């Protein structure tokens, strides 16, 4: 074997222990193939040749020393055995030589990567087996290389990292090992850069091909043309186009007061061509038309005569003349709340409204309402109204539980607190006392009240002479209707304005109180929150109705305590007394000034007062006038309250100039 050539020590374990053999590197591959086929486990320890030579030299020295010790003779003097030349111990070297050799042995062991002494053999073998089981591969730090080939574990030791085996292993690892993946990296994008896209035109000279890797560009579609509503060029007669403060257009019908966003349907041209040209009637100066930019306000007057019949009355008269007086009954779902008695003195024109409302409140707020007798024991009933009677029906069996003749009903009304409370007063057949019957309706009680009013109108028209022969005969027949009076529609004046709101005031009268309430609402309510409303003024009520909406409030003229104009001539307000200690102020903004509205409310108050005077004077002088055949005198120079109301409304426009003295009326 050549000097410098490494030798291999192979330990094979298969059922029995075999001694280690020293083989050359040329036989390593053959042994590996044999051990992989025949042995269960194999341990191969590679050591360098220089240490093997050193161990052989030490062994030869030990052997020579031992032989030399045995060949020498000893001299015994006085019982003491003494060497002749130099004393050696059993190992054949002196103490000084033993110290040098011991230090050399320790140095050798310190330089060795693996201790091959008997005391560390099992520990080294366990470490090698553990490394082979875990499949650990040395990285070169400890100078040990472990490989697993089949059932054989091979460990190579090298002291120099630049030795032949280390270089060979590195070259083989680079050729056989798969490429390592780069370590994971967290990419943090602080700000995304916008890539400016270059769109090449077909006419460009520098670009002759299309880049297939360029990002596709999606060209946005042009927006669709806006849908324009075709506005009619010529509006139908009576329609006008205006714009609100936000710039939106709306259409207003002057006669009916209808306001809508959609343009009105055009009138048929053929019909319009056949129709005669309209006559242009110039309005008198007492009825001016006030036009504004934000909205148009027109003061119109409805000519209502007491003897003038409406279209429904004309239809009813035609049906009566033809002999057709039958109307289908109308039914409502109601629930009886009971009844209470009312004295006959409270059924006058001045007290009946308060008496009926008090009866409704008493029956709806009583704590012992379960003990009060009710029709149908408080169950849901059907109220049927026809031209003859008012009947209460059982919804299950349709049997009549109670009925009243229409002529026997004295008064009817709707509750103030709840719009679904309906009541009527009639005389009881057994006790001959007046009873107020109260019902809770599923719908608005005004529908029942209006239906009952229409029935009474038809009954009055049926009793009225329907031909000119009866009128020309000169026979004046007085028809007594058993307490049933003809219902009359009150004349109303409608004015359009902005409603600011209602606020509570401490007193019922006073211009300072009114101005303070007006200033408070003007400062608290922004102009865009004002409600465009129609104020309907009649001698008995002032109704505030939102344009094309629901009713906001309804005030009784009899409870109006103060009326005035604010510091700004466009602000009008009045104070209503809701209870003995509660007063509410209603504030309005009128264009161009509030004088017209103030005069209308003033005229309604005067007519209300005149109506009360007429009622008292007629009751006081009724007996004397009936004897002498005279008519009752009137406070307003022989004019009725309808004519007085018409004259007052006609004179409103002549006093349109605002005045500061009109703040307190």
From Swiss-Prot:
Residue ranges of every copy of the PID domain listed in the record: 330-456, 499-615
Tissue: Expressed in the pharynx (including pharyngeal muscle and nerve cells), ventral nerve cord and tail neurons.
GO molecular function: amyloid-beta binding; molecular adaptor activity
Post-translational modification as stated in the protein's UniProt record: Phosphorylated.
Location relative to the cell: Cytoplasm; Cytoplasm, Cytoskeleton
Function: Modulates pharyngeal pumping activity, at least in part by regulating expression of the acetylcholinesterase genes ace-1 and ace-2.
Protein name from the UniProt record: Protein Fe65 homolog
